[in-house]
Amino acid sequence: MTRRNKRFLSLLLALTLAVSLCVLPAAAADQTCPSSKDDPVVFVHGLMGWGQRAGINAMLPYWGMTTGSLTSYLNSLGYETYSATVGPISSAWDRACELYAQLTGTTVDYGAAHSAAHDHARYGITYDRPLFSGWGTKRAVNLVGHSFGGATTRLFLELMTNGSAEEVAAAKAAGTAPSPLFTGGKSSWVHSMTEVAAPHNGTSFIESNGTIMDVATNLSETLAKGFGITEIKNLYDFQLEQFGIYKDPNETVLETLQRVFSTDFMSHNDNAFLDLTIDKSLEINDGIGIEPNVYYFSYAGNQTVQDPVSGNYIPSAKMWTLFYPGAYNMGKYYDKYTAGGFYIDKSWRPNDGMVNTVSAFYPIHSDGTCLTKDGKQGWTNYDGYSNIHFQPGLWYVMPVQSFDHIQFVGGMLNGSLVKTRALYRGIMEDIYSTYTTAATGTAFPFTDVAESRWSYPYIKELYDAGVVSGTSATTFSPAANVTRAQFVTMLAGLAGADVSNCPATPFRDVPEGAWYAPYVNWALANGIVSGTSA
């Protein structure tokens, strides 16, 4: 036994009666990208939005709206920021593919399988150059998504991490190479993800505003077709070339009009309006995990107040007037089931005019859970001011903001320059504070182990060494007793042991599928334990 292991063993023995632990998950293979404070921030817009590539952005920047360009302001403070441009009404999948192509400066590949399933072209527009240099080789990216930009960036990260076996197989069958987006192994290319007013779990706006939604979808499709074949496309681009909505120079004007306006975009079931429903959002969430190396932040808004008579939620005086009808309907829509069986309770009434406040906290799966890959709670509330070290692999739910949906990006006539810029200065500070944490070693996350506690230095040293973790993302339970199973798990971690091929023990109280079974098997095989009975 080395001197180092002897030292750690003595620490374990000292803590035997005072600590508890959980098994640390194994790290996944990754095409590692270095991460540093040189990593830029890329903003991803929501439904009907635009980025710096759109002509309209010079006149009315999406990020900043009537308060002026937010990215220019943040750049003046020394931050490197960009605003991506993806399809305003495209699905989360298509937008994720477009985001990848924009970050790499390539042609959009929507995937052979996805394109066939939704009956549209596999390839889309070409981005002439990367949004910034060095992504994936020298720098990672920090993503900030507003509204539907949340689902876009979360699905993007999932594909970057785990890829799509279906798309790889479909590309091979077609005799083509898959997009690198679908091969996965690139989670370290994303350092953090911040979502503002993002309907992680869908929005009841769609369910409660049927007439408004019918008008919105029909108008959007008509505008997309008209803009797509005229010079207005340079000002505002719906980017629906994959559906045949584009101007063909080899056609007459009449031929183009007939071809484009005969298409039925909504019938492809590959659009933002569908993905924003509660049922579809939960379906998307079921395929997305929380990555242990990525930092997550989420901001929800509420610009409604409770009616003292009905108890429902109505728009506040500070909400943009155009949001009033939708917000009012959302504020009284509850005690109902979606077509997929999700129950909308009273907590879904407060909203920002477009998104339910509760839906913007953190993403849940269809079973209602939000868990890390090792089964722990995947979110925690943060008060916005406590001096803590943010940890990766955990959603930090920030304090609810008194913003309507558009005030989060500057507002329309009701925006506040001071409030908007203060919000994003805080977001930048939180993002870049995570690099300070990384540079000074593994941050100690346990709020129930004060530095003044006698066991603090021992627990911290074992935590830094990867021998122990906590009973949750932020708790260690230092007064809890240690079980025999937990102790041999610590010993195996200390020894760096391979516990995968040890024969099973005869102990009836060690089920084969138990998390601790491999560690007990290892301990018995090496003569460390003998059992409390035969």
Question: Locations of the language-model features?
Answer:
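Bacterial N-terminal signal peptides that target proteins for export
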Residues: 2-12
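Hydrophobic core
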Residues: 13-17, 21
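Extracellular/surface recognition and adhesion modules
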Residues: 17, 459-462, 523
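Sec-dependent signal peptide cleavage junction
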Residues: 21-31
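Feature responds to low-complexity, polar/acidic, surface-exposed segments characteristic
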Residues: 26-28, 440-456, 469-488, 492-517, ...
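N-terminal non-catalytic accessory region
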Residues: 29-217, 384, 389-440
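Extracytoplasmic/secreted envelope proteins and their assembly/folding machinery
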Residues: 67, 71, 93-96, 100, ...
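Helical cap/lid subdomain of alpha/beta-hydrolase-fold lipid enzymes
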Residues: 158, 163-440
